[in-house]
């Protein structure tokens, strides 16, 4: 084999090798190679990155919490809502709306002072009340506070947050005409225990308040009002005891009578006697007759008995008065407790006026009885005078014989 043949064989092998390599390059370009990240995953990654970017921005809605109100839902800051939740647990309320109602009742004086209007209790549907607080704090009075509502103890409380609790100002409100003792409420507030607080660096919602029983407060308020009413009744002026004296029958005064004051000694005796009668458990007779002296026939009144009002059982010296047997009615036997009803006179005098009215309402019957009694007395006196004349005549005749 010569040298030319060897060269031809080498060229053929090179051509084959070259051709095979070219086919491999073509096949490699035409082959499909899978990619490491599909296009869908890249799109999801892009959207997730934008979502994380948007979550970093907090909207204003996240800072508010919905709390159930009275018939509707209201919005308030989260710190206020947290405080409302805590108060609901501490006060034992059934819902947060009840706690909000309690807070509005406590703030009623401040609402009236700020708006100039308000109802007692507050009308939540029409009253424009915004539970927004400056400085993200909600000031509330302590649980053991002065009773609720102005005329029923309506007071205004101011709680000092910076001082740690303990400064309260009670101002009574004369909205409905009730008069309360301001000094008594102030002393009561000053004697109350201060509110326990956590140091200022911690959350406001962790302040602790004592639980309150509103029913006990209402009972205490009613007892205090009853005591004040009793004190005002007992401190009122008492009516002086008076005697009703009828005029002589022939004086022409008609049914006129006089009211004479009882002397001091007689008044003391009357009080002691009335106390004894009350203690003994029996009532004195409503009418006491006082008979005039027997020797007063020439005075014209005769020995007629005059009836006086008597709440006691002692004899009153009235011999110098000659009265007609005018029945003045059944007066009060025992002095009734004085109850002022806003009139210029106590009610103890009203019983006397009622008795006089009933006496005069009988009209002609009382006058007829009085005239009959007067006629009987005059007839008796005439008989006595005639008997006396007959006796004197007989004596004169006997002496002449």
UniProtKB/Swiss-Prot annotation:
Primary localization class, coarse: nucleus
Coiled-coil segments: 364-389
Compositional bias per record (Low complexity), positions renumbered to this chain: 42-56, 365-376
InterPro entries: TF_TCP_subgr, Transcription_factor_TCP
Pfam families: TCP
GO cellular component, one term: nucleus
Any Gene Ontology biological process: regulation of DNA-templated transcription
Complex and partners: Interacts with PP438/PNM1. Interacts with SPL.
Name listed for the protein in its UniProt record: Transcription factor TCP8
Gene name linked to the record: TCP8
